Design a protein with these regions (language model features):
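Histidine-rich, glycine-flanked metal-binding segment
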Residues: 2-3, 11-57
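Glycine-rich, flexible loop/turn motifs
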Residues: 44, 73-74, 128
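General beta-strand structural signal in soluble alpha/beta enzymes
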Residues: 48-49, 105-106, 134
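Metal-associated gating/positioning segment near the N- to mid-region
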Residues: 53-120, 142
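Metal-coordinating catalytic core of metallo-dependent amide/deamination hydrolases
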Residues: 123-155
Length: 155
């Protein structure tokens, strides 16, 4: 298993303690050790100098819509094809992981099972993204934002 040593980072550990200088040893995709003050003596395949950089635990998005990309009006949710929505959801997953979110709770998506499909691809390692607790299609009352009936559909 690959080992990465991150040296000289300012570490925020989310315990309530003040940030501190130190080293992090990562094995695979898990933090194996945190050494306050630095000086980790463990061997590593890769060493990263994080001087002047900040390390913290991944964040969790508690109300996420992977496929709601640049949505400024209901039309932006309804008019894209299912194929376009798949790519939007994949980009949404990538944007979250790139921003430091390692988990997302899906509130709903523009198409049925969209977050489930993206979650499955992320879990299989074929798509970059956070851990996804997938939600389904948005449920809405008549006339509200999620209503796709003929009378309210802008298509």
């Amino acid at each position: 298993m690959a080992r990465t040593l991150i040296r000289n980072a300012t570490i925020f550990d989310a315990t309530g303690a003040a940030p501190f200088a130190g080293d992090l040893l990562v094995e695979g995709n898990r933090i194996a050790a945190v050494v306050k003050g630095g000086g980790c003596a463990e061997p590593a395949d890769t060493v990263i100098d994080a001087s002047g950089l900040f390390c913290m635990p991944g964040m969790t998005e508690g109300h996420g819509h992977l496929s709601f990309e640049n949505v400024t009006a209901t039309e932006n949710l309804i008019t894209p094809t299912p194929e376009e929505q798949v790519f939007a959801a994949a980009r949404g997953a990538r944007a979250l992981i790139d921003a430091g979110f390692t988990s997302v709770y899906g509130a709903s998506e523009a198409k049925l099972r969209l977050a489930v499909a993206v979650r499955n691809e992320v879990n299989a390692g074929r798509l970059p993204g956070p851990r996804i607790r997938a939600g389904g299609l948005e449920i809405s009352v008549t006339g509200a934002m999620g209503d796709e009936s003929t009378g309210h559909n802008p298509r």
